[in-house]
């Protein structure tokens, strides 16, 4: 709501590093992608509400996988709860200015393509909104 983006840090075993990320998760059977995104944001960060918009749908690896990643932008969310993490999750949540996130993108601080693509899309949409 104050112009900052919600980011997370968590250890990723595959690369053996602490990764800076945006909130993400799995759509459960029978669940709509929007509802999954809202649930994951609340569970991982404690933020709820706001206005939600799907900004892109991407295929992580269409050569060998059939899953899709639905990417949402949530505007005006508020911290209303504590984290409700799974037993295997250890997530540090922090707020970051848009300018700082853009600098982090340019430096390569985000290592997951599924995080980088929606962040660049977000900044492209912000730039387009400013032209209007």
PLM features: residue spans?
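Helix N-cap/coil-helix junction residues
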Residues: 46-47, 110
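Nudix hydrolase/Nudix homology domain
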Residues: 18, 29, 54, 63, ...
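Conserved Nudix-box catalytic region and its N-terminal flanking loop in Nudix hydrolases
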Residues: 1-39, 77, 85-87
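A short coil-to-beta-strand element that immediately follows conserved catalytic motifs
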Residues: 48-55
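Active-site-adjacent beta-strand/loop module that shapes the phosphate/pyrophosphate-binding cleft
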Residues: 61-81, 94
């Amino acid at each position: 709501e104050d112009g900052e983006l919600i980011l997370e840090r968590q250890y990723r075993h595959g690369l053996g590093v602490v990764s800076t990320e945006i909130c993400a998760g799995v759509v459960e059977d029978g669940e709509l992608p929007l509802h999954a995104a809202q649930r994951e944001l609340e569970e991982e960060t404690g933020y709820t509400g706001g206005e939600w918009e799907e900004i892109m749908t991407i295929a992580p690896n269409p050569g060998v996988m059939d899953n899709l990643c639905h990417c949402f932008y949530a505007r005006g969310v508020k911290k209303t709860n504590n984290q409700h993490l799974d037993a295997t999750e250890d997530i540090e949540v922090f707020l970051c200015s848009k300018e700082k996130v853009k600098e982090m993108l340019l430096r390569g601080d985000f290592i997951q393509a599924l995080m980088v693509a929606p962040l660049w899309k977000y900044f492209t949409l912000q730039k387009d909104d400013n032209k209007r």
